[in-house]
Amino acid sequence: VLVGVFDKEPSDSEDVSASADKKLTGESNKKPQVPDTEDKKTAPATEADEDNETREKPNTKVPSRTVMLYVVGSDLESRYGAATMDLMEIEASGVNEKKTNVLVYTGGAKEWQNTLVDEDENYILLLEDEELTVVESHKAKNMGKAATLTEFLEYCEENYPADEYELIFWNHGAGPLYGYGLDEKNGDLLSLQELSDALEDSPFGKSKKLELLGFDACLMGSIETAWVFRDYAEYFVASQEIEPGQGWDYAFLSELDGCKNGDEVGKVIVEYYFDFYEDLFKKSPRAETEITLSCVDLYALGDVEKALEELFENIDDDLGDGTIKEISRCRYKSKAFGKFASSTSYDLVDLKHLATLLEDEYPDEAEALLDALEEYVVYEDSNVKNAGGVSIYHPYDTPTLAKDASKLLNALSFAPKYVTYINNFSKELRKSGSGSNYRSFSKNTGEVSVSGDKSDLSMQLTKEQLETFSSAKYYIFKELPAEETFSKQKEYLNIFSGQDVTLSASGELSATYQGKAVFAKKTSDGEYSEFPLSMYQIYDGTLEEKYYFPCMFYDLDNGDFPDLLPANWLMRIRDGKPQLLNAYDMASDENKEFPNKYLVNAEDYELYFFGNNSYTVGTDDNGNTQLTFTGSSYGFEYERDDFSLELRPIDYDDGYYAVFVIEDVYGNTHFSSFFRLGE
């Protein structure tokens, strides 16, 4: 049994095995706890209920509950001890055990960081007298199989009946296309179809719905995921964005006595989640990251799907008339999720923000969808601009996946007209001749006007280029001295990427480069790095002075970590000073579909490498500018306690160049010619 109170700490790398006194007392001698139950009446069906489904009236008093957690340990447990931390939170939650059964199914990890759970078996744990106790165990099964989940649900319903049931999925999440729950022992996960199959074979359905179903996992707050559970649950709680490694705050269990229905439970979960992270970010500013969590009413999902279908059926009808250009621009501008914690693009955007952007072209249909979403989203909170509580898959970065996505969504009977639309939209994006308007882009002449440190950059687009323009950014490169390079060609380091580019009605691109870059400084001798760091401004539907830069973390003596860990380190510029935030461990090749929800704690590493990738500049077969990565990275090593970052002016005489980078409405990228700064 895990004993003792556990309070979450800011450090993501805490050694859980050393943080608590853990004992194994064996199986429970208690019989299954059966709280008193009460009958619940149903409301009469309405015309909106196409399946003649009835909705239960709200409870007038607090019901008895059985809360079920399906905890797939994965590397989150074997590497970080994250499941153990949450089990300890459950023990310390103070939940009223007389009214609430809490049962946990564990497995799917190669190693567990406590003595209660063993990797060779799967366990069902029951919370008794503030301790988790084994009530059932068997030889380890694959938690990525639907049957394993179904068996757990059957066991709980049969042995721990209650007025209401809540089900929480704990582990990795990767959105509707990839699914949930990586069992690292079997290399398997649960797809949306498998989750649907598991619930279909379980005791929970139209006659006995779960009061609430939630995902303590990344990226599962999509309309497609919610659709899977519409027949099996009343309310749904999940995050649109990547969840931090600490996940939910299970102290919310103590508040269940004050909740009569699932919407109230969902609100408590969201509030505890945000209270915890607000406190964490105050104590540890470097831990700050984007967080979202929402509770939605699955009963209102049918109206959302209907409005979604009407909007995108009309858009689909217009794609052949050139509407693809404007729709593509709206898609690009939509708030996106899961952009920086994995090399995978999930193509998930905020549905409310997307609908808002489409209002100019389709005012009636977009407004109807927004109205439906208002009824659907019961409660949501975030520290993210344009996050409205529900995301949707919309192809853009990876249009080739749309065909497979369509098969998945069609099998789930989700929004067939929308599925037809995303197929047609993707086909338009992949048209082979779509980038022809920019074949002469490298001949466009860039202009520079320097005032002090600042450089005003501009470039005129042709009428044809303007027609298919979607977005623009600019890069700043530094030419390497010949004696510094590894090749015979000129090499350039990418030191800055800016997203704040404007386009006039006449087709003129303009941007202002402040003429400053971030340099690393050695604290012990005051020496600055020879080159600036590579800074990439973040754009995910919002534009702030927030950047990331690639780095490597070295652990010189800890065998539990790789010798070399690649990461993206986030940074904010405030009052002219760089402020380091969190760093994301870039997902490994074997688990690349799943974002790594655990942030890198830089304090765990003794040596940092800040590198700049080197490129050569040439032309492609059409005469357009082409950048080629040389395979080399130039940079500098700094000890953990012997560096700082400073924003400093660059010397234009050292050979700095600008280039505009255009993305057209079909997803093609085009580079302008290089033009020298300071001349």
Task: Please describe what each predicted stretch is.
Residues 2-13:
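Hydrophobic single-pass membrane-insertion segments
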Residues 73-74, 108, 171-173, 396-398:
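Residue-level signal for short, function-critical loop segments
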Residues 16-27:
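Short extracytoplasmic/periplasmic juxtamembrane "stem" segments immediately C-terminal to an N-terminal membrane anchor
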Residues 23, 30-60, 175-176, 180-215, ...:
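Terminal, contiguous helix-loop blocks that mediate binding/assembly
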Residues 63-66, 97-102, 160-166, 206-212, ...:
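Loop/turn elements at helix/coil->beta-strand transitions in domains of secreted/extracellular proteins
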Residues 106-205, 217-218, 223, 240-241:
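Catalytic-core segments of thiol-dependent peptidases
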Residues 44-161:
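N-terminal extension/subdomain marker
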Residues 68, 168, 391-393:
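Residues in well-ordered beta-strands of folded domains
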